[in-house]
Amino acid sequence: MKITVEHLPQSTVRLDIAADPEEFDAALERAFRRISQQVQVPGFRPGRAPRALVERRVGRELIVAEAQRELMDRLYREALQQHRLTPVAEPEVEIYQDEPLAFRVEVQVYPQVDLDGYRDIRVEPREVEVTEEEIDQVIEGLRRSRAVWKTPDEPRQPRDGDQVIVDIEAYEGEQPFQEPLRQATFVLGESNLFAEIDQAIRSLRPGESAEFDISFAEEDERVSPELRGKTLHYRVTVHEVKEAELPEVNDEFAQSLGVATLSELRDRVRRDLLREKAQAARAEVLEQAVQRLLEVATVELPPALIERQVAADVERLREQLRQRGSSLEEYLRFQGKTLEEFKEELRPQAEARLRRYLVLEAFAEAEGIAVSEEELVAEIERLALASGSPEQFRAFYSVPSVRSYLADELHERKVSERLLELVTEGRGAVIGEAARVLAGAEPAEGTEPAAEEAVTAPEVVDGETTPASESAESLAVTETGSRADDDQAS
C-alpha cells in the first residue's frame, strides 16, 4: 500500500491510497470466494464452480466492486492508524483507478494542537489580604440576616432597608399582562426593582396605591424579552411596611452563631474571607494561565466537531427544560428565535469551549499527565472515609460511569496544578498567609456550622415572606444589572 497525506484547512486531510497489485489480487480472490458461495452454477456445488464460470454468470464488475469495498475499508483504517488520524466526520471517497485499486479520501480529523513556547509562560502569584472594613461588612450582613421585622409605631412611607409587602399589577391596554405579583416581599435598596416601581412604593403608606406607565426600550437587555418594546400600565399597592430591629454586635450575638466571643467571630470571619479571596485569586491566576496557553496555541477546529458540540449543547438544554416541565420549542418561542438562529448563537461559545478543551488536553499530553488506577482508588478511599458511609460510597463509585466522572475530575485537577506550578515557577497561585489557608487550614475548634455564613452574602430572613413566581417577578425586577440604579443615576 502506498499513502500520500496532504493537510488541508479546517483540520481536513486528503489521503491518496493505492493498493499493491498483490494486495488487490488477493482481495479479488477473497471476493470471488464469497460470491461463489451465493451463486448457483449448474453442475457445481456452491463455492466449487470455476472462477471463469462465476464471472460469466455475475459479471466481473461485481467481483471487482466487492474486492474494492473490502480493500478500501481495510486500507483506509490502516492509513488512519499509521498516521495517527482520528476522523470526526464521514469521509468523502473517490475511486480513480479500478485495478489495482487507487482511491482518494477527504475527511475531517481530530485536530492537532501546536503549543510551541508554552513552557515560557509566566504569571505572577497573588498576595491577598482582608481589611477590618470587609470584616465589618460581613458582620453587618450576619446582623441583618437575624433582623426581627416589626411594624413601625406610626404608619409611614417606606425607606431604604425597610421590608415591604406589595401587590404589583401590569396591564397592556385593558388586559392584564401576565400573572400579577400578590403579597410579594421586597427589601428596598436590596432588590432590583424597576426605578419607577421603587419610587412609587417609597411614596405610599400601607393601604395606598399608585398607578403609572413604564415604557421599555426594544434593545433593553436588562428586562425580560416579553417586556421589550412595550408600554405597560402599572398599579402598585403597599400592604405592609416593616422596619428591621437589629441585634447588638457583642459576645451574645457571636454565641448565636456558635462562636464563644465576638473576637473569635471576627477571627473566623477573617479566615473565611481570606480563604474565599485566596480561592478567587487562585482561580484568576489559573484562568490567566489558561488564556496565555490559548494565545500560544495553534489549532484549527473541524466544522464537524463544532457542529457536534452545538448539537450536544442543544440536547443538553432540551433535557434541562424537559426536567422543568417545559420544552425547547416553548423556550425558542419565548426567545423569538428559530432553532437555526439559536444554534448560530451557540456556535461561538461551542468553538471557545472546544478550543480550550483541546489545548488543555494537548498540554496534559505534553506534560505526561495521566490518572493512574492507584490514584483513582486512593481518591475513592479518601472520599469514602470522609463521607461517613464508606461502604455505600464505595459501591456508588464502583459504577463505571461514576468512576469515569471522578477520573475526569482528577485529571482536570492534575492539569490545573501542573499548569499553576509551571507558570508561577513553583511558587503557587497565592503566596503568604493566604497560601497556608488555601492549603486547608481546619476550622477552629468549637465553631458551629452557622459561622460558615460569614463568607456568603446573607439574605434577609423573614418567615412571612411570600415568594413570587419567576414569570410574575419579571414584571418588576431586572434580569441582569440594575435598571433601577441606572435610571436613578441618570
From Swiss-Prot:
Does the record's keyword annotation contain Cell division?
A: yes
Q: Which GO terms describe its biological process?
A: 'de novo' cotranslational protein folding; cell division; chaperone-mediated protein folding; protein transport; protein unfolding
Q: Mind listing the UniProt keywords for this protein, alphabetically?
A: Cell cycle, Cell division, Chaperone, Cytoplasm, Isomerase, Rotamase
| Primary location class | cytoplasm
Q: Which Pfam families match?
A: FKBP_C, Trigger_C, Trigger_N
Name the reaction it catalyses: [protein]-peptidylproline (omega=180) = [protein]-peptidylproline (omega=0)
Record's domain comment? Answer: Consists of 3 domains; the N-terminus binds the ribosome, the middle domain has PPIase activity, while the C-terminus has intrinsic chaperone activity on its own.
Q: Which family does it belong to?
A: Belongs to the FKBP-type PPIase family. Tig subfamily.
Protein name, per record? Trigger factor
Q: List the source organism.
A: Thermomicrobium roseum (strain ATCC 27502 / DSM 5159 / P-2)
